[in-house]
Amino acid sequence: MKLKSFIGVVVAAMLSFVMVSCATNEAKFELGDNSPVVPLGVTKGETTHYLTDYYPQWVGADKVTSSDERLTLTNLAEDWSEFAITTDADAFVSSVEVWHDGKALSIVVLGGKRDTEGSYMSSVGVEGGVVKVEATQPVKEAVAVWQNNIIEDVVVEGNSIAVAIPVIAKDYARSVVRIFAASEGGRFNDILLPLEYGNVVTEAKDIRRQDHQSQVLYSLMIDRFNNGNSANDWKINSPEVLDKVDYQGGDLAGITAKIKDGFFADLGITTIWISPITQNPYDAWGQNVNPDTKFSGYHGYWPIYSTVVDKRFGTEEELREMLSTAHNDNMNVILDYVANHLHINSPVLQEHPDWTTELILPDGRENIALWDEQRLTTWFDKHIPTLDLERNEVCEPMTDSALHWVKNFDFDGYRHDACKHIPLNYWRMLTHKMKSAMPERNMWQIGETYGSVELIGSYVKSGMIDSQFDFNLYHTSRDVIVDANRSMRDIAAVVEESEAAYGSHHTMGNITGNHDKPRFISLAGGDMPLWGIDDKAEGWHREVVVGDMDKGHAGLQLLKAIIATVPGVPCIYQGDEYGVPGANDPDNRDMMSFDGYNDYQMKEYAQTQAMMKYRRASMPLMYGDIRTLYVDDAAWVFLRHYMGEWVLVGMNVRDTAKSLRVELPSFAQCGALEVAVATEGASASCLGGGNIEVVLPPYGYAVISK
């Protein structure tokens, strides 16, 4: 059924709901922080849930209810702060209502797993305040929410869904409608539609910097980025410390200078992630062998004082200037914060030496770098003891220290270090304090966890952390691009796995690399082997280069095409925008260069600029659903679609060109095509009947729009 005729059938049925929703449900809308909360996942049997994981401001509730007979709710605490849901159903969508003082907000309930084989739905249009969605299979049931309020009248007809936008949405500068549905075969992808005063946002110019799905991150290490104030330069200047691991002079003023000269804006960056700024020691610690050297705390990860700006990076006034300059340039700044440990000479540990976990295990071993065996207690090194954050008397003051930076400075959120090693109660307490103290601040938190999607996802809740870096996507992409024995199917599979685990509109960080990994371009170019070497030692004993320049730069460009076009938030590590080579830490932390690029690097920079700017200008890439149209060992072609607009992406990881024919879904008609961003030699053309031919050069990609 065409959009107009379908809308005509349902508008009359919905009109009464649209007109009276303000009068009947307004009390619900005023309850607490109504920022959209993540869905609640259940499986057959009983699952336990914590209220603050969804509504972090609420310590408890009067009751939690559901009108769905498939769900049995059990109160596990007097105040419903902990409750259980029991169900025998599978692959369904529903909701529960959380009540407080006679008012309620909802949590969407998703049963079973997402069907990534054939259950897709897409937003195809809006008319008269009614959104139409088309699915690939008959829809069994659907749930739609505005913020966290159930939209009562949702019309389902065959493969179509119609959802009315509540009139009250017109009173809000930014709100969202989310749509969830299931077929007999499984759950569909979910749909998220940002609204501007009640109207669906269809143009990127109306997206705001606080809209998290629109972010493009840039990760920088302050000391190694730009020196803007030589008056605060300082080195240990000891024969015990090689210059490579001593302070180099980068500071907050240097970041401000690069914001002002347009460096970040020219790259399409919307959010700057800065390394830790807390006071670190003035002496040297740790010990490297061959070559022998100790280390300074130039990186910022050895906090002495958790609430003091390290004067080698600048002053509080310079920090405020940097933040205001970024905001005036329509950019966010998030702070890298270290909660897992303190330096052994921290006054806090001098006063409370018992606040750490045990260094010696019962079997006599030292509890150092036992990342998985002793995940929540292991120390990183002897001079940075891990805090016992499972104890309330430790967790309370340490979350207060973290809160200091967003209460007293206008940061837009955090990048949290070593999340994997910090217990869940810390994240619940910190986010509760943040939401309670500053409910009007739309802050974003992203964490660092290596592990399974289950472990990573256990932290991704509205009452804990918004997202994490998707290291599984990075490692899979790295291996497929570098190793010809790996398959492009592996990348497609991990993208589907992430969508199923974190949601279709997750804001997981998709990285080009980071300060703890060898430079990707040296892996892709072959100068750094993937396996069988000490990737840190390589940087001490030789000059690590790209290797095969053509292959190295093509591989890095392909990686950036992946992270910018799949769901999630792309993140550029400093230097990767132009392709600086290097081994692992500390060779991947050389001082940043802003000029003097060779021809390859200039081309690399231009590709990064074009890709990230296009991503920020494309509603389908920021908010669209994703479906695979073709995949084999060498190539992957997928579609991103949003409100009738689509982008086709093709990628080829082999050294021979690929010519592929793909068929578009019925609602994504072919027309005049534009190759928006692509490797030289890529092309696309309409063949009729909804078919497109895509030509991809060796190690090439193409981003195509209509």
Q: Where are these predicted regions, by residue range?
A:
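Bacterial N-terminal signal peptides that target proteins for export
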Residues: M1-V10
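Bacterial N-terminal signal peptides
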Residues: V9-V18
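Carbohydrate-interacting/catalytic domains
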Residues: S21-V37, D79, E97, S106, ...
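Substrate-binding/active-site clefts of carbohydrate-active enzymes
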Residues: D211, Q215, F225-F409, M429-M438, ...
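Hydrophobic faces of well-ordered beta-strands that scaffold small-molecule active sites
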Residues: V216-Y218, I272-I274, V333-L335, Y414, ...
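A solvent-exposed, charged loop/short amphipathic helix patch at secondary-structure junctions
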Residues: N232-G250, A524-G547
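Active-site-proximal helices and loops of the catalytic beta/alpha 8
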Residues: H341, S401-L403, K407-I511, A561-T565, ...
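Aromatic-lined glycan-binding groove of carbohydrate-active enzymes
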Residues: V494-K536
